[in-house]
From Swiss-Prot:
Its main location: membrane. This is Calcium-activated chloride channel regulator 4. It is a single-pass membrane protein. The active site is at residue 156.
């Protein structure tokens, strides 16, 4: 992802804050530059293209009406796999690739579960990552279960573009309303239907009334909500867009604040329409007075990769070993990273530019060696970036009349006052510019080039032991190559050693990789002693030593052995800087490798605004849980901040166990560029695959009520959501690019960061006490320890949300906060209870740090005290077992709630729900 600073291009860049790879623009009410990518694993079927066009066209009209004539789809690019046959209609893509996909058409995440979903791991109101549709869904084979694809696309689009959430909750499909009835979680509450148990076996089906679980006092897990086929209710698209009458989003009038929907949980009980109407899209448009035109489609077919290296050999590259380090990284790129079949050329530049290699198609090591021989050897002259770029365009143009989709890989360590003069040419070229900035002085204008062309931007310091240059080049794999063909980094580390010390460690090669495994060693002064053993203890020899470039490398033939590889490197100079990089490719094209993708939530930021680090670990589209994930954030002065990333659903992490590991970053040390690198390690019996459907998936409709009878849809394949597959040991590293921070004051930084919001507050009951549990926040967001907690209760959700300080306070004298990310528990006993038929108690927490900074109000936990009113026959005799929580005896406090009306007649049953507020 390209980065930028607002010096030369302040007016252009001031709105481009978020680290989002999408190119979608809103222009005169129409969404432009939407990219829909068909995954290479999808078998060729031209009907898929036809159905995509039909889906978007239908969706455009539906979206236009649903948004009060504000938005429609203007133009869409469909990216077709390279392995599909040629067609005269297909053009070569420009910046469109998998990295910039807004919609991905791919096989289901889990076999047989064609569930559409939107990948979201940020807060309410923030854009999602991408939409995932399956081929069968687009081909209309799942219409009964999910509704027409056009309406479904609008449902998912609202996730993607406006950051709203579903108005149902499969984890809490029912709730007890204030009316004392059990209701299906939905919006609006006016959607009618029946709650039934419907099971089929053999050729017969049985329908019966739902039974109440004696523990939860809600319907059992086998109960489902079957909507009436004929409805009059118009809302909501984020509940069941498949209902014919539904044409609107829930608004303030129709929104159901009682339901434990994900929209309520994540969006502070605001309606979906309220979130949408507060978006920049909404604020910057007015309703149209005429119907919109139909969408325009571009059919683009992936073709062979074309890349030209544009390398700085100016005089400044002679300092700090920069030229040699660039050559080491470029050789690694040419030897290992760039894929077979790619076309590669090379240009050098200083005050002028020189074509060194015209495009060569890589078929074997011969072409790779030819290109390596052309790397620069002597630094001299000034810096003319535009000369280098123009010569790269010339190299590409000699073989291809159009530059569309070709890549320019530009490395420079200097500024060029004339670089901005070729920005328009770059923008119009159709080429992609990747920029590696080496050192503090690298040019700002080129950052803008990478941004507008869809390229990547990396910052690399002069601290060789951080291995930043090799990491940056290694991250520049093709954006459109099948994942099985991509080079994956298993290890990247370095040390500066004294007294001829050793650098010893291990590298794990798991069974998902092993093909084209490549070990690279670099040094600063003298070749080290190198020893490498495979998992069986066999020593690996025959390293190729390149004394000129101060590197040695070894390619493992065939598929490398699975297991732990050990290495010993002994420095022969004092001091000495050594690095090791290990890369590999998928062992089997039919088994997706484990991957790590890292990013920041923003590309540009200003103090004191916090940033968030994200690292997503997947095997295919299935999340990997239980990994140890560490982020390394390096500033321009070489200082590295180390953060443990967590997938615990607390602090910066939006969803627990979704394979996205997150953490706040606030340890700014200076103004300027920072780089991100992530290391992930999964140990045996700790890392595992979570075999559960993806989050934020569209609601599956089990069937319809037609003329009073249930017409069932085919049942979904059953998956035990607690099923997990334990993974073997694995290791991965990944570069997350660069970001820019400004307005950082002199150190030490003032304390401006409150504790992070508690988002996982839970309430249960033990005997006569209410037990609260949550994840501890820190003194500064999720670091350190808070000073104290304030717990308040109310009979009204909105009172806690809007007037927390006026609600009744619980005595927390005995509550001693723990370190951030620890589990907290606290028990209190409600007293002086008055009697009514049924009452809800809502509970929320604020945290206060040592500087008296206060967190946002937590999510709101709800307990309900009531007398069961169901007939004894409706009580399920075999309720779902739930563990009895044990209260923390040190955290036991009474609370006088005489002003709060609770209900108790006879025996009291307390049931918990979890709601949320994000103020």
């Amino acid at each position: 992802m390209g980065l930028f600073r607002g010096f030369v291009f302040l007016l252009v860049l001031c709105l481009l804050h978020q680290s989002n790879t999408s190119f979608i623009k809103l222009n005169n009410n129409g969404f432009e530059d939407i990219v829909i990518v068909i995954d290479p694993s999808v078998p060729e079927d031209e009907k898929i293209i036809e159905q995509i066009e039909d889906m978007v066209t239908t969706a455009s009209t539906y979206l236009f009406e649903a948004t009060e004539k504000r938005f429609f789809f203007k133009n869409v690019s469909i990216l077709i796999p390279e392995n599909w046959k040629e067609n005269p209609q297909y053009k070569r893509p420009k910046h469109e690739n998998h990295k910039h996909a807004d919609v991905i058409v791919a096989p289901p995440t889990l076999p047989g579960r064609d569930e559409p979903y939107t990948k979201q791991f940020t807060e309410c109101g923030e854009k999602g990552e991408y939409i995932h549709f399956t081929p069968d869904l687009l081909l209309g084979k799942k219409q009964n279960e999910y509704g027409p694809p056009g309406k479904l696309f609008v449902h998912e689009w609202a996730h993607l573009r406006w950051g709203v959430f579903d108005e149902y909750n499969e984890d809490q499909p029912f709730y007890r309303a204030k009316s004392k009835k059990i209701e299906a979680t939905r919006c609006s509450a006016g959607i009618s239907g029946r709650n039934r148990v419907y099971k089929c076996q053999g050729g017969s089906c049985l329908s019966r009334a739902c039974r109440i679980d004696s523990t939860t006092k809600l319907y059992g897990k086998d109960c489902q909500f079957f909507p009436d086929k004929v409805q009059t209710e118009k809302a909501s698209i984020m509940f069941m867009q498949s209902i014919d009458s539904v044409v609107e989003f829930c608004n303030e009038k129709t929104h159901n604040q009682e339901a434990p929907s994900l929209q309520n949980i994540k969006c502070n009980f605001r309606s979906t329409w309220e979130v949408i109407s507060n978006s920049e899209d909404f604020k910057n448009t007015i309703p149209m007075v005429t119907p919109p035109p139909p969408p325009v489609f571009s059919l683009l077919k992936i073709s062979q990769r074309i890349v030209c290296l544009v390398l700085d050999k100016s005089g400044s590259m002679g300092g700090k070993d920069r030229l040699n380090r660039m050559n080491q990284a470029a050789k690694h790129f040419l030897l290992q990273t760039v894929e077979n079949g790619s076309w590669v050329g090379m240009v050098h530049f200083d005050s002028t530019a020189t074509i060194v290699n015209k495009l060569i198609q890589i078929k074997s090591s011969d072409e790779r060696n030819t290109l390596m021989a052309g790397l620069p050897t002597y630094p001299l002259g000034g810096t003319s970036i535009c000369s280098g770029i123009k010569y790269a365009f010339q190299v590409i143009g000699e073989l291809h009349s159009q530059l569309d989709g070709s890549e320019v890989l530009l490395l420079t360590d200097g500024e060029d006052n004339t670089a901005s003069s070729c920005i328009d040419e770059v923008k119009q070229s159709g080429a992609i510019v990747h920029f590696i900035a080496l050192g503090r002085a690298a040019d700002e204008a080129v950052i803008e080039m990478s941004k507008i062309t869809g390229g990547s931007h990396f910052y690399v310091s002069d601290e060789a032991q951080n291995n930043g240059l090799i990491d940056a080049f290694g991250a520049l794999t093709s954006g459109n190559t099948d994942l099985s063909q991509k080079s994956l980094q298993l290890e990247s580390k370095g040390l500066t050693l004294n007294s001829n010390a050793w650098m010893n460690d291990t590298v794990i090669i798991d069974s998902t990789v092993g093909k084209d495994t490549f070990f690279l060693i670099t040094w600063n002064s003298l070749p080290p002693s190198i020893s490498l053993w495979d998992p069986s203890g066999t020593i690996m020899e025959n390293f190729t030593v390149d004394a000129t470039s101060k590197m040695a490398y070894l390619s493992i033939p065939g598929t490398a052995k699975v297991g732990t590889w050990a290495y010993n490197l002994q420095a022969k100079a004092n001091p000495e800087t050594l690095t090791i990089t290990v890369t590999s490719r998928a062992a089997n094209s039919s088994v997706p490798p484990i991957t790590v993708n890292a990013k920041m939530n923003k590309d540009v930021n200003s103090f004191p605004s916090p940033m968030i680090v994200y690292a997503e670990i997947l095997q295919g589209y299935v999340p990997v849980l239980g990994a140890n994930v560490t982020a390394f954030i390096e500033s321009q002065n070489g200082h590295t901040e180390v953060l443990e990333l967590l997938d615990n659903g607390a602090g910066a992490d939006s969803f627990k166990n979704d394979g996205v590991y997150s953490r706040y970053f606030t340890a700014y040390t200076e103004n300027g560029r920072y780089s991100l690198k992530v290391r992930a390690h999964g140990g045996a019996n700790t890392a595992r695959l979570k075999l559960r459907p993806p989050l934020n998936r569209a609601a599956y409709i089990p069937g319809w009520v037609v003329n009073g009878e249930i017409e069932a849809n085919p049942p979904r394949p059953e998956i035990d959501e607690d099923t997990q597959t334990t993974l073997e040991d694995f290791s991965r590293t990944a570069s997350g690019g660069a970001f820019v921070v400004s307005q950082v004051p002199s150190l030490p930084l003032p304390d401006q960061y409150p504790p992070s919001q508690i988002t996982d507050l839970d309430a249960t009951v033990h005997e006569d006490k209410i037990i609260l549990t949550w994840t501890a926040p820190g003194d500064n967001f999720d670091v350190g320890k808070v000073q104290r907690y304030i717990i308040r209760i109310s009979a009204s959700i909105l009172d806690l949300r809007d007037s927390f300080d006026d609600a009744l306070q619980v005595n927390t004298t005995d509550l001693s906060p723990k370190e951030a990310n620890s589990k907290e528990s606290f028990a209190f006993k409600p007293e002086n209870i008055s009697e009514e038929n049924a009452t809800h108690i809502f509970i929320a927490i604020k945290s206060i740090d040592k500087s008296n900074l206060t967190s946002k109000v937590s999510n709101i936990a709800q307990v309900t005290l009531f007398i069961p009113q169901a007939n004894p026959d409706d009580i399920d005799p075999t309720p779902t077992p739930t563990p009895t929580p044990t209260p923390d005896k040190s955290h036991n406090s009474g609370v006088n709630i005489s002003t709060l009306v609770l209900s108790v007649i006879g025996s009291v049953v307390i049931v918990n729900f979890i709601l949320s507020t994000t103020i």
